[in-house]
C-alpha cells in the first residue's frame, strides 16, 4: 500500500528529527486508523496507539494478533458509516490479549466525523495522553 509506505516515511522522518526520544506513538482516523495499526505491526519501536473511528466493517484487522502495544480506540455512538458493534468487537478482541491494555471509548452524540462533538473527542484524548505519559514517568 502506498499509504502505508507514506506513513512509514513520515515516521522515519520524525525519528530522525527526534533521535533521543524513548516513546513513539501512532494515531489514525478512519482509514488512517487502519494504516496506524498496520504500521504498529511493522515497527517494534511504537509504544502506543490511538485509533479513532476504525473501520472493521470494511477492512480486516485480524493482523493484530497479537497486538504489540497498548492504546485506545474511540468511536462515535451515532457513526453512520461504521456500526458501533463492529468496533466494540474489535476492541474486545484486543482487550483479551495479554501484556497490553486497550481502552475503548464511545462518544455520545458523535457521528463518524465527530461533527459538533470534537470537544468530547479532544477531552478523552487529552485525558488518555496525560494519564499514559504520567504513568511512564512515575
Residues of each region from the PLM?
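Active-site nucleophile loop of the alpha/beta-hydrolase fold
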Residues: 51-59
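Short alpha-helix in the alpha/beta-hydrolase fold that links the catalytic acid
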Residues: 69, 83-93
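Alpha/beta-hydrolase active-site loop
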Residues: 1-17
Amino acid at each position: 500500500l502506498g499509504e502505508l509506505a507514506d506513513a512509514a516515511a513520515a515516521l522515519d522522518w520524525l525519528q530522525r528529527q527526534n533521535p533521543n526520544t524513548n516513546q513513539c506513538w501512532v494515531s489514525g482516523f478512519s482509514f488512517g486508523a487502519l494504516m496506524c495499526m498496520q504500521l504498529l505491526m511493522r515497527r517494534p519501536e511504537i509504544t502506543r496507539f490511538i485509533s479513532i473511528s476504525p473501520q472493521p466493517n470494511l477492512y480486516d484487522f485480524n493482523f493484530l494478533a497479537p497486538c504489540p502495544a497498548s492504546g485506545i480506540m474511540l468511536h462515535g455512538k451515532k457513526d453512520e458509516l461504521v456500526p458501533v458493534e463492529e468496533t466494540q468487537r474489535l476492541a474486545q478482541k484486543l482487550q483479551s490479549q495479554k501484556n497490553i491494555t486497550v481502552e475503548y471509548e464511545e462518544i455520545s452524540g458523535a457521528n463518524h466525523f465527530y461533527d459538533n462533538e470534537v470537544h468530547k473527542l479532544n477531552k478523552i484524548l487529552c485525558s488518555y495522553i496525560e494519564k499514559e505519559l504520567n504513568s511512564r514517568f512515575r
